[in-house]
């Protein structure tokens, strides 16, 4: 067992990550893994991994490992962690230099053994080579050659010195001391020979050299090469040993912390049980000091460890566990960096030696935690789906069983025999009578009473027999009775009277929701079928003897729809238990209740208490979202599936706004800050302490709030409330100073406005009858509407009446009226309409001529002016008469008009020529009559009078005649005025 587990917990320490002599305040009580790593990066070996500081008298070189693994007391024992060999070996180098200052040139050989990390081994040189060097003083040439060898080795080593330094800073220890592997024997020998040729030959060319001296130099060179190769081998062995030691120590650390966590988990299990069972208290009478001995078996050791851990973990707190976790994280990361190359940076730049910070992220915010939560959500939803599928399969199986039972319990529908025609029935009755008579003749012992009805049957079978009619009526009534009885359930099969239904309902109810079992159904079916058979036999016995079965009936086949129903077994009504009624929305089970703990992101808070408050509303929130959005399922959908606009709506509807600013509520035109107790409680829930700052509400928010108030209060209530607030505000400002801060004003206003708002609301509720929340409809207004008789019940239905249809007259059918299509009849029929058309066209031609002839128009205007100057009175009177005068005037008026104005005469002549060219269905006589207006003066006057009555809507005198002409001059003026008036109207 490791020495770290042997210490006695005399003081009841919770976690024993390292021996008791360690500096616990430096390692276990650090706040973060970064602090542990910074302590681990110290230059001295005493601060590495939180181990105890060695005594100053001890030699700390790594070759002297007498203290490693030796059994010592729990307070003073040495453990060497060679995670960083440079600091340890540098200290050994300094101590060794102080001890070996008097040694001559052996230090030069030892200086050759420096690597990129300044690692120096002590006493690795062979004893005989060291003695030889001490006995035989080296010559200048040899010493110079050794210096050159050192320079060569140093030049080969220092090529990657910077790389090694950066790698050591980044904790890549696997590359330390790796440069000497590249220096082969051939390279060393080549360098020595080159040094000898360079230094000896040019420098001592003029000096005679003896053969003995040359041999000594060669021997020294050979021994030097041998020593260098030996030291290289030893260095490689030392590196392998160091790597192996690091792996062993890493396993030791991992095993140690694994045991600590295992004991912690064992301790937490009974602690959780005691939390649910407060009666069982962990006993404190256990011994506080236990020691695990190596010679005891493993089971006993584990039991003792468990007993010791129970006493130690009994007083554990969350802070101690957190400190233990931090220290373990730091040590394990340090070990990982030393052994795993992937955990370190591969860059050799000196500027990139920054330490990668490991943030102290909360457990519920880490990526691994989120992945586990998502995995649990998907797994729980999959489990819920599997449960629903299995439930549906169970229900389908139950319904299948019910359907099978219903089909098995169905009775047979028995139909009566087909009704035969009367003639066939008479023949069958005759055959039956003959057979009966034969039977009577064959059996003379039959009593005479049986022979009496035979002659009576012949009389009764006659069509006029009343007995046959009565029998038919009885047959029909019997058939109707059978049909009614078959439709009504028998009395002994009703659930109230049957012996099967007298049993308790608990015996009939099964787990699948069926009230009647299969065996009971079969028994009941057999009993009911036997009852039906008995009834059938009794009914057959009561049937009339005249209905006899014969073989001829089997050959008759009729449709089942035409045959009456004889017997019918009423179907049973099966009811399922209420738990099996299908609902459109299945409620989740208790096992899936943990799904509702996750809220929408907009509703999540920073602390556990706030999230616990929202847990009760989670299910209602999911149900609400599923009702609004059909694509969202209350159980299967994830919280991330909630649409974005629902999040925004939730944020807008929230009364509390969480953020860096204080939570403020708006009342009317002022900001009301929450009370100190409420704000501190919200700060504790949200996990932060916001700084209160004065806020000013914008005009838009004021309008929005005012609009919301108008929805709940009437205009009168709003006016009273505004007046009350203004008076309170004036009262507050009168008693306050001008140098008050914004926050103090807000606090003062908040208290006043709260009280005033409550009182105003109570007063308005008591006084105002238009409060939307307290509208009461009296029953006197509702009761008459309920008792009122509906109108559609009084609608009268129209009745039918008899209509006498009279035939058409026969004399009118044969006669047909023949229309006369001769020209004379046609002209007489259309003469009046043609005259009206002529008058219309004359007026149209006159107005058309005035529009086209601008000269005539200008002359007419000039003439009008002259007439107005000469005859103002006459012209005015002519204008008054123009409305009543006909538009189509005779040729006399045209001649009178031409007397003063020849242009008008020309226009009239042109007009007459146009009328001659028109193609009317008129004869030559009619055309001559139209040109001669003197002969048909009366017809023209009548037509013009009728035309005026239709077009201009003028009133005609009662006598039906126009006013008489007074003079020819006046007629001329009237005609001229009529033409000017028409021209003005057309303009």
From Swiss-Prot:
Post-translational modification: Acetylated on lysine residues by KAT8 upon ionizing radiation-induced DNA damage; deacetylated by HDAC3.
Region (Disordered): 708-738, 949-972
Superkingdom of this protein's organism: Eukaryota
Positions with biased composition (Basic and acidic residues): 718-731, 959-972
Record-linked SMART domains: PEHE
One Pfam family recorded for the sequence: PEHE
Domain (PEHE): residue spans on this chain: 794-915
Residue positions where N6-acetyllysine is found in the record: 859
Molecular-function annotations in GO: histone acetyltransferase binding
Keyword Phosphoprotein: yes
Phosphoserine: residues bearing it: 462
Cellular component GO terms held in the UniProt record: intracellular membrane-bounded organelle; NSL complex
InterPro entries linked to this entry: NSL1, PEHE_dom
Gene3D superfamilies per the UniProt record, alphabetical: 6.10.250.3170
Glycyl lysine isopeptide (Lys-Gly) (interchain with G-Cter in SUMO2) cross-link, renumbered residues: 134
Keywords assigned by UniProt, alphabetized: Acetylation, Isopeptide bond, Phosphoprotein, Ubl conjugation
Protein's name according to its UniProt entry: KAT8 regulatory NSL complex subunit 1-like protein
Gene: KANSL1L
């Amino acid at each position: 067992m490791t020495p770290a587990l042997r210490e006695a917990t005399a003081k009841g320490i919770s976690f024993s990550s390292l021996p008791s002599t360690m500096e616990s305040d430096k390692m276990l009580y650090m706040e973060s893994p970064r602090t542990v790593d910074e302590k681990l990066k110290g230059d001295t070996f005493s601060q590495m991994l939180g181990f105890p500081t060695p005594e100053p008298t001890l030699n700390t070189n790594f070759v002297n490992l007498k203290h490693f693994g030796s059994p010592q007391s729990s307070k003073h024992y040495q453990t060497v962690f060679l995670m960083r060999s440079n600091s340890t070996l540098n200290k050994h180098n300094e101590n060794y230099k102080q001890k070996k200052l008097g040694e001559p040139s052996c230090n030069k050989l030892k200086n050759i053994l420096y690597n990129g990390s300044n690692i120096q081994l002590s006493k690795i040189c062979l004893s005989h080579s060291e003695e030889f060097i001490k006995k035989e003083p080296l010559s200048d040439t040899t010493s110079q050659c050794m210096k050159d060898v050192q320079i060569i080795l140093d030049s080969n080593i220092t090529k990657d010195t910077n790389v090694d330094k950066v790698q050591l800073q980044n904790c890549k220890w696997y590359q330390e001391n790796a440069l000497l592997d590249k220096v082969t024997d051939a390279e060393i020998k080549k360098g020595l020979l080159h040094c000898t040729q360079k230094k000896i030959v040019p420098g001592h060319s003029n000096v005679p050299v003896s053969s003995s001296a040359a041999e000594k130099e060669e021997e020294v060179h050979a021994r030097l090469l041998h020593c260098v190769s030996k030291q290289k081998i030893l260095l490689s062995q030392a590196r392998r040993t160091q790597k192996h030691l690091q792996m062993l120590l890493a396993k030791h650390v991992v095993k140690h912390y694994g045991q600590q966590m295992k004991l912690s988990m064992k301790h937490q299990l009974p602690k959780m049980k005691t939390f649910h069972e407060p009666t069982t208290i962990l006993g404190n009478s256990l011994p506080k000091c236990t020691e695990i001995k190596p010679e005891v078996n493993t089971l006993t050791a584990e039991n003792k460890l468990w007993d010791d851990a129970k006493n130690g973990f009994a007083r554990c707190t969350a802070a101690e566990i957190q400190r233990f976790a931090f220290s373990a994280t730091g040590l394990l990361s340090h070990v990982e960096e030393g052994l795993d190359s992937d955990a370190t940076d591969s860059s050799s730049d000196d500027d990139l030696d920054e330490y990668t910070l490991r943030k102290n992220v909360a457990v519920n915010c880490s990526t691994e935690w989120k992945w586990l939560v998502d995995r649990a959500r998907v797994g729980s939803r999959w489990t819920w789906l599997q449960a629903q599928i299995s439930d549906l399969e169970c229900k389908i199986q139950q319904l299948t069983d019910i359907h099978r039972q219903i089909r098995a319990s169905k009775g047979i529908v028995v139909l009566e025999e087909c009704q035969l025609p009367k003639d066939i029935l008479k023949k069958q009755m005759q055959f039956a009578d003959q057979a009966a008579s034969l039977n009577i003749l064959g059996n003379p012992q039959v009593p005479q009473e049986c022979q009496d009805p035979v002659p009576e049957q012949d009389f009764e079978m006659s069509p006029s027999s009343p007995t046959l009619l009565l029998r038919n009526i009885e047959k029909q009534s019997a058939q109707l009775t059978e049909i009614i009885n078959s439709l009504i359930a028998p009395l002994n099969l009703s659930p109230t009277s049957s012996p099967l239904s007298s049993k308790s309902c608990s015996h009939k109810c099964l787990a699948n929701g069926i009230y009647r079992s299969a065996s009971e159904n079969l028994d009941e079916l057999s009993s009911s079928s036997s009852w039906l058979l008995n009834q059938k036999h009794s009914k057959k016995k009561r049937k009339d003897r005249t209905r006899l079965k014969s073989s001829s009936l089997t050959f008759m086949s009729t449709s089942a729809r035409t045959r009456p129903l004889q017997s019918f077994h009423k179907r049973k009504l099966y009811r399922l238990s209420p738990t099996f009624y299908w609902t459109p929305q299945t409620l989740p089970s208790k096992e899936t209740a943990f799904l509702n703990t996750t809220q929408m992101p907009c509703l999540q808070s920073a602390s556990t208490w706030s999230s616990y408050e929202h847990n009760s509303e989670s299910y209602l929130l999911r149900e609400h979202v599923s009702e609004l959005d059909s694509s969202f399922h209350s159980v299967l959908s994830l919280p991330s599936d909630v649409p974005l606009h629902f999040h925004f709506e939730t944020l807008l509807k929230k009364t509390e706004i969480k953020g860096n600013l204080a939570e403020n509520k708006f009342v009317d035109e002022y900001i009301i800050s929450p009370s100190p107790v409420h704000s501190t409680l919200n700060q504790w829930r949200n996990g932060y302490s916001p700084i209160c700052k004065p806020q000013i509400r914008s005009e838009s928010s004021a309008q929005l709030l005012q609009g919301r108030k108008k929805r709940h209060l009437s205009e009168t209530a709003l006016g009273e409330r505004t007046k009350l607030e203004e008076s309170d505000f004036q009262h507050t400002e009168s008693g306050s100073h001008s140098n008050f801060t914004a926050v103090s004003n807000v606090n003062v206003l908040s208290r006043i406005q709260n009280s005033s708002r409550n009182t105003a609301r109570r007063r308005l509720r008591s006084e105002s009858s238009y409060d939307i929340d307290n509208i009461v409809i009296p029953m006197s207004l509702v009761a008459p509407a309920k008792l009122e008789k509906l109108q559609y019940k009084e609608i009268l239905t129209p009745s039918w009446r008899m209509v006498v249809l009279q035939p058409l007259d026969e004399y009118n059918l044969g006669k047909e009226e023949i229309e006369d299509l001769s020209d004379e009849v046609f002209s007489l029929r259309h003469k009046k309409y043609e005259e009206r058309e002529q008058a219309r066209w004359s007026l149209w031609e006159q107005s058309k001529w005035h529009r086209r002839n601008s000269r005539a128009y200008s002359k007419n205007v000039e003439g009008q002016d002259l007439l107005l100057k000469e005859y103002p009175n006459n012209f005015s009177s002519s204008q008054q008469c123009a409305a009543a005068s006909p538009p189509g005037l005779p040729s006399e008026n045209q001649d009178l008009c031409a007397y003063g104005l020849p242009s008008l005469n020309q226009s009239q002549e042109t007009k007459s020529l146009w009328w001659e060219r028109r193609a009317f269905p008129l004869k030559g006589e009619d055309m001559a009559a139209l040109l001669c207006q003197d002969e048909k003066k009366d017809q023209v006057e009548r037509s013009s009078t009728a035309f005026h009555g239709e077009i201009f809507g003028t009133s005609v005198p009662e006598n039906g005649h126009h006013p008489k002409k007074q003079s020819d001059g006046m007629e001329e003026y009237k005609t001229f005025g009529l033409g000017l008036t028409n021209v003005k109207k057309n303009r």
